């Protein structure tokens, strides 16, 4: 519960925004292989209409994770229950699910509500002996007091708990995504946006008549680094998403691009061409001191930090075509990582540092691929068109990326094993350059 205060502060900062999904999530593959789970609609214990149904958020989260497949409500043997005391294990003997989520919502005075939920081990319930206590069936049980405006955010919190308890992996439902929306024909067509991972609570950080690109989150989730051409040249900025305060980090002649925060949040790795060819540099955010990392006549670009902060993944053409390399900051030692396919570029690193995710070109097709750094096994994850800009969820289970669908730039998502796929179409404009936030 130590993160609850931080979560409540974050939700209060965005709860005044309209509840609207700017990005839909359309699941296209992977439902059949998901693990079955039952989510009983939470019981309303007040008079009048319920503000909103938190369990709907939980069901959607679990389905979108690609890991779980919530059962249809009409197929559930019990509905209208919210506690273990009301749970009838005998009624659930034939239900194909591994767990049951149930809960209640009760007015608590003013605009406050007491929300309770329980996570029941259905497999254990179906196998239980006479000597087993019903309390042994409870995997987790919690309650908290929130406002109506916090219902959706707390639904994500419940989903995080359920996901972690059943998989051992931290849930990433209380995260956000930054992206660029382009509406051609408007006076200021470029918008830097952030939204909850599921497209709700969209917020515009910046609008410009000139291109915006390459947003990247700070490790604390408080700021974004990005490239802006608002002054008719490429410049790198860092902007606090809550105070809106902006700081210009680099504004050299030529390329100022591909900013990405170091794991400690104190530096940016960037691509600059101030000394000739595009090269990778590290900039101290506080002092603006610059250290050159690469020095080669070929193009070096698109840096990404390994979790230990001691090395970078970069795209380099020093071998004749774009490939991914690892460069160590202290020694300058550089080694090539990718060899399969015509091109490999735009790399990201999994949170555990064991895999890289990147754009792979084979036979002229650009798709998202993953490579295990120990075995060097590469797997192409997607079959969409003109894929670009992969960004990994902070728990390492999903990748969000840009692609083209029906002639329009959209976002899409794929699980790290390639089994689950989803498309995230926007209502208006083209969407590109996604960046998944850290845990918030």
Swiss-Prot record:
It is found in: Periplasm. One of its GO terms (biological process) is cell division. Residues 1-21 form the signal peptide. Keywords: Cell cycle, Cell division, Periplasm, Signal. Disulfide bonds: none annotated. InterPro entries: 6-blade_b-propeller_TolB-like (IPR011042), PD40 (IPR011659), Tol-Pal_TolB (IPR014167), TolB_N (IPR007195). One of its GO terms (cellular component) is periplasmic space. It comes from the Bacteria. PANTHER family: PROTEIN TOLB, PROTEIN TOLB HOMOLOG. Part of the Tol-Pal system, which plays a role in outer membrane invagination during cell division and is important for maintaining outer membrane integrity. Belongs to the TolB family. The Tol-Pal system is composed of five core proteins: the inner membrane proteins TolA, TolQ and TolR, the periplasmic protein TolB and the outer membrane protein Pal. They form a network linking the inner and outer membranes and the peptidoglycan layer. This is Tol-Pal system protein TolB. It comes from Shewanella pealeana (strain ATCC 700345 / ANG-SQ1).
């Amino acid at each position: 519960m130590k993160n609850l205060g931080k979560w409540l502060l974050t939700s209060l900062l965005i709860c005044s925004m309209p509840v609207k999904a700017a990005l839909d999530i359309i699941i296209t593959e992977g439902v059949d292989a998901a693990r079955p789970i039952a989510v009983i609609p939470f019981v309303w214990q007040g008079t009048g209409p319920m503000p909103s149904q938190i369990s709907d958020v939980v069901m959607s989260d679990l389905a979108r994770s690609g890991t779980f497949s919530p059962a249809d409500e009409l197929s559930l043997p019990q509905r209208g229950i919210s506690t273990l005391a009301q749970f009838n294990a005998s009624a659930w003997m034939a239900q194909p699910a591994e767990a049951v989520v149930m809960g209640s919502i009760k007015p608590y005075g003013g605009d406050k509500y007491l929300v309770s939920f329980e996570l029941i081990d259905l497999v254990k319930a179906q196998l239980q002996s006479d000597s087993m206590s019903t309390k042994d069936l409870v995997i987790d049980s919690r309650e908290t007091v929130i406002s109506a405006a916090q219902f959706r955010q707390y639904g994500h919190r419940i989903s995080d708990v359920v996901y972690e308890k059943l998989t051992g992996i931290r849930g990433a439902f209380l995260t956000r995504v930054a992206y660029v929306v382009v509406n051609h024909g408007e006076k200021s067509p470029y918008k830097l946006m952030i939204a909850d991972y599921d497209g709700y609570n969209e917020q515009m950080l910046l609008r410009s008549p000139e291109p915006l690109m390459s947003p990247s989150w700070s490790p604390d989730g408080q700021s974004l680094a990005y490239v802006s051409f608002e002054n008719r040249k490429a410049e790198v900025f860092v902007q606090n998403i809550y105070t809106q305060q902006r700081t210009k980090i680099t504004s050299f002649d030529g390329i100022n691009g591909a900013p990405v925060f170091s794991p400690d949040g104190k530096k940016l790795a960037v691509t600059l061409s101030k000394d000739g060819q595009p090269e990778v540099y590290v900039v101290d955010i506080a002092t603006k001191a610059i250290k050159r990392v690469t020095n080669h006549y070929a193009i070096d670009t698109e840096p990404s930090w390994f979790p230990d902060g001691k090395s970078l993944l970069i795209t380099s053409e020093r071998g004749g075509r774009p490939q991914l390399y690892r460069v160590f900051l202290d020694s300058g030692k550089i080694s090539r990582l990718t060899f399969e396919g015509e091109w490999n570029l735009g790399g990201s690193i999994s949170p555990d540092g064991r895999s890289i995710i990147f754009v792979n070109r084979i036979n002229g097709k650009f798709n998202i691929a993953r490579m295990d750094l120990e075995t060097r096994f590469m797997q192409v994850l997607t079959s969409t068109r003109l894929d670009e800009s992969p960004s990994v969820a902070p728990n390492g289970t999903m990748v969000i990326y840009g692609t083209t669908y029906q002639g329009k730039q959209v976002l899409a998502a794929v699980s790290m094993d390639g089994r689950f796929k989803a498309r995230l179409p926007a209502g208006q404009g083209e969407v590109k350059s996604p960046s998944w936030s850290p845990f918030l």
